[in-house]
């Protein structure tokens, strides 16, 4: 997941990619990718965190801060979405805690390490 996130950051505005740190130690990252053209009212969010920090509420807080940042700095964005794997229950819970709702389940659309997975689409709308 970290590698795909890094690939996304290489194609993005560096101001939209933020480090997640604990005591000045990099433990993860979160980024927002505003879409263009007919999708310009949307932005995709991605994130990752080191496994030793899972379950501590850190990502939920980072997502909440990124949502506030995005809606505060991108007036045309009305929807932020994330696409966790269907079997990534922890990521689904984190998104739900941060106010995202499930919009879609796409069956067998992704492949990771040779395993075909469902893709979920979670989103939050501008209040």
Annotate each PLM feature.
Residues 5-19:
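A short helix-loop-beta-strand connector motif used in the catalytic cores of GNAT acetyltransferases and
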Residues 17-127:
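Acyl-donor (CoA/ACP) binding surface of acyl/acetyltransferases
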């Amino acid at each position: 997941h970290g590698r795909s996130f890094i690939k996304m950051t290489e194609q993005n505005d560096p101001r939209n990619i933020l480090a997640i740190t604990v005591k000045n130690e990099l433990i993860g990252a979160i980024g927002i990718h505003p879409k263009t053209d007919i999708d310009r009212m949307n932005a995709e969010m991605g994130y990752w965190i080191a496994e030793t920090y899972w379950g501590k509420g850190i990502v939920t807080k980072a997502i909440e801060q990124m949502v506030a940042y995005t809606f505060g700095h991108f007036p045309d964005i009305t929807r932020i979405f994330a696409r966790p794997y269907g079997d990534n229950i922890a990521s689904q819970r984190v998104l739900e805690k941060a106010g995202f709702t499930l919009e879609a389940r796409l069956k067998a659309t992704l492949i990771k390490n040779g395993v075909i997975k469902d893709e979920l689409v979670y989103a939050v709308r501008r209040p």
